Structures are given as C-alpha cells and as structure tokens.
C-alpha cells in the first residue's frame, strides 16, 4: 500500500497537479491580502489552489479562482469563496513577473499556500504548459524509475 503524502507543518494547501501540467521555471514567494474569515477558513485547511492563476492588473498582482470555503462560524459578513485576492509584492517584482507572463505560453501558477511567521504566503511559479506527449513521457519515466527502485530494493 502506498504511503500517504504528509504536508510540512506550515503547508495549508498544495497544487500538486500543477507540477504535472506545467514546467515550473522559476518560483517566487508572495504575501496575500485576506479577510478575517478567509484566514480562519484557510487555517482549517479548506483552501483549494486547483485551476487558480495570478495576473497583473493596473500595476498590481491578483490571484484568481482560488477557492476558500466560507468560514462555518462566520456571520452574514462572510467572504465570497472565489473572489480575486491581492498579492503583496514589490513593484519591481510585479514588473518582472508581468514581463515574463506576457511571453507566449507562460503563466503564473500558485504552487503552495503556507504560513511563515504567522503570515499567509503563496509560492508562485512561472510556468509553461506541457504538451500531452510530454506528460505521457513524464509518467513513463516515473514508472520506470519506480520499477528500477523496486528491483534494487528486492535485490538487497
């Protein structure tokens, strides 16, 4: 039976599918502006990074389609689960990432949501989409490596 993947203590959500769908070329850490009910919900582990992306609008960076479930004990002032959330980066970093994403084929994909010194951070990856044959080849390589490791383990 396969071992269950364990998250590191500060990791709240991870986009594992992104590493399968994209070639990650560069990563950068960014803060995220959240409401009170959002951070409470995130700490409970009810955040989902699947299908989310970041983009530059009017000189600011926003993360879109990141789903944070409504906080159960929240009242009528609870947050919208799919609202755009502002990322906290220096102006030079925003300009640099904006230039990279204007190139054809590049996207900003959130890879991980975690806590660092009590602050919620997002690890963004500058990524280029993989073609279907690249995904198949990666799965074949992974299976071959697993078989080799299993054979070596059985041998000794």
Swiss-Prot record:
HAMAP family to which the protein is assigned, alphabetical: SmpB
PROSITE patterns according to UniProt: SSRP (PS01317)
Biological function: Required for rescue of stalled ribosomes mediated by trans-translation. Binds to transfer-messenger RNA (tmRNA), required for stable association of tmRNA with ribosomes. tmRNA and SmpB together mimic tRNA shape, replacing the anticodon stem-loop with SmpB. tmRNA is encoded by the ssrA gene; the 2 termini fold to resemble tRNA(Ala) and it encodes a 'tag peptide', a short internal open reading frame. During trans-translation Ala-aminoacylated tmRNA acts like a tRNA, entering the A-site of stalled ribosomes, displacing the stalled mRNA.
Keywords: Cytoplasm, RNA-binding
Pfam families: SmpB
InterPro entries: SmpB, SsrA-bd_prot, SsrA-bd_prot_CS
Subcellular location: Cytoplasm
NCBIfam families referenced in this protein's UniProt entry, alphabetically: PRK05422.1, smpB
Cellular component GO terms, alphabetical: cytosol
Family: Belongs to the SmpB family.
Major place of residence: cytoplasm
Species of provenance: Staphylococcus haemolyticus (strain JCSC1435)
GO annotation, biological process: trans-translation
GO molecular function: RNA binding
Gene: smpB
UniProt name for this protein: SsrA-binding protein
Transmembrane regions: none
Top-level division of the source organism's lineage: Bacteria
């Amino acid at each position: 039976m396969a071992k269950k993947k364990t998250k590191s203590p500060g990791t709240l959500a991870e986009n594992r599918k992104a590493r399968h769908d994209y070639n990650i070329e560069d990563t950068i850490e960014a803060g995220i502006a959240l409401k009170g009910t959002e951070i409470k919900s995130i700490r409970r582990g009810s955040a989902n990074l699947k299908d989310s992306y970041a983009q530059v609008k009017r000189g600011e960076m926003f993360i879109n389609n990141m789903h944070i479930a409504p906080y159960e004990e929240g009242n009528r002032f609870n947050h919208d689960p799919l609202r755009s959330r502002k990322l906290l980066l220096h102006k030079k970093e925003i300009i640099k990432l904006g230039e990279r994403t204007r190139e054809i084929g590049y996207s900003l994909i959130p890879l991980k949501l975690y806590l660092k010194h009590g602050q919620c951070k997002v690890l963004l990856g500058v990524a280029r989409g993989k073609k279907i044959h690249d995904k198949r080849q990666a799965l074949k390589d992974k299976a071959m490596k697993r078989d080799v490791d299993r054979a070596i383990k059985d041998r000794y």
